[in-house]
Swiss-Prot record:
Residues 1-162 are annotated as: Disordered. It comes from Homo sapiens (Human). One of its GO terms (molecular function) is zinc ion binding. Residues 40-61 have a biased composition (Acidic residues). This is Zinc finger protein 428. Keywords: Metal-binding, Phosphoprotein, Zinc, Zinc-finger.
Length: 188
């Protein structure tokens, strides 16, 4: 049957050698047993089996287990993460110290700095301006620009897209793309 060699002969490992004896399965393991490979009855069962294999959360059997854990579980399965905590309470206004409008005690006026939309119309000036300064109107067309600047802008509007390879100008992005593809093929 089988021989066990001494550890000195095999380098510390025991080996089994087969004799000429035919080792066929016993009567309890016939070739028609339930352990033989069988095809699933339908594609639906096959899909269900594949899903079960892919969604296992057992790290011993699932090589992608750690990735799934980082990403929040497998496909459509319930997440094992703890539910998110409620948002922390809103901080009081850094300028006046009052609670934000939604958390202010009833009857107290809202903070004009935190909630300018609900505060009375007497809102203070924004932080960027000092009191007494007026807002400047945006410059009107033709005002505040040097005369030579208009010509440069018109030139840029004609060819707003520039090739980075040869500095040619194009009216639209499609033309520039086509030109760039010519560079890529070596035709330009």
């Amino acid at each position: 049957m089988t021989e066990t060699r001494e550890p000195a002969e095999t380098g510390g490992y025991a080996s089994l050698e087969e004799d000429d004896e035919d080792l066929s399965p016993g009567p309890e393991h016939s070739s028609d047993s339930e352990y033989t490979l069988s095809e699933p009855d339908s594609e639906e069962e096959e899909d269900e089996e594949e899903e079960e294999e892919e969604t296992t959360d057992d790290p011993e059997y699932d090589p992608g287990y750690k990735v799934k854990q980082r990403l929040g579980g497998g496909r459509g399965g319930p997440s094992r993460r703890a539910p998110r905590a409620a948002q922390p309470p809103a901080q009081p206004c850094q300028l006046c110290g009052r609670s934000p409008l939604g958390e202010a005690p009833p009857g107290t006026p809202p903070c004009r700095l935190c909630c300018p939309a609900t505060a009375p119309q007497e809102a203070p000036a924004p932080e960027g301006r000092a009191l007494g300064e007026e807002e400047e109107e945006p410059p009107r067309a033709g005002e505040g620009r040097p005369a030579g600047r208009e010509e440069e802008e018109e030139e840029e509007e004609e060819g707003t897209y520039h090739c980075t390879e040869c500095e040619d100008s194009f009216d639209n992005l499609g033309e520039l793309h086509g030109h760039f593809m010519l560079h890529a093929r070596g035709e330009v």
